[in-house]
């Protein structure tokens, strides 16, 4: 069965899309730690990020860099942090999180509750900065 993230890429489940190329896809995390929290995934369905081939892992990181630079423009911050957990969804993903402090990277923090309009505005701001 396809992962929830493959179903997002296929358009079967809605998302707030940020960017896409032939191999990778970026969309907002639905339970964001901060505004601008974005996930980058390979379209290829692989659970563990370190099971990607060297070439695909390197290309995913380069794609994530483009998204991270756009997040930093759209949401001024000290730096955009990157994390990989993958304990919940078995489809490799990089979390990109604009940080004002180390505390913004604590996954145990309560998550933001945003309206659909707010998610849409955040995704368009990042897309526009790409
Ligand atoms: P983890 O696998 O531990 O890195 O966590 C999975 C992340 O995916 C969590 O931050 C979730 O909020 C996020 N997530 C799960 N389902 C969706 C979805 N349908 N759209 C956007 N983000 C999601």
Which residues make up each language-model segment?
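HIT superfamily nucleotide-processing domains
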Residues: 1-130
